[in-house]
Amino acid sequence: MTSFEDREKGEEAKFHLEQELAFKARARRNHLFGLWAASQLGLSGEAAENYARELMTAAFGKHGDEAVLAKIEADFKAKAVGLTLDAARIRMELERCLAEAHKQLGIQR
């Protein structure tokens, strides 16, 4: 094998590792975000875990983050009368959860 081939294989391995870590971070972020949203809706325990799983499933759909944000905004409007969290605050929490996911997984940003 030439050094060029070695370098190419190394770059491919690095790319795959980065993709895997990004996937794990997004999945962890969605779980943390789902638990946060569940707590805002007054859910706890198994109900909160189930809600977090619903959001994780929504995130893997066609529209990804936008589907998650739309679901949360709709649920907040439908279930949490008087809850005053606007879209900007919700997106800020999503970013906080991503940072926490990176921290928990030991991923440098």
Predicted segments, located by residue:
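A charge-rich, low-complexity, intrinsically flexible signal that marks solvent-exposed coils, linkers
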Residues: 1-109
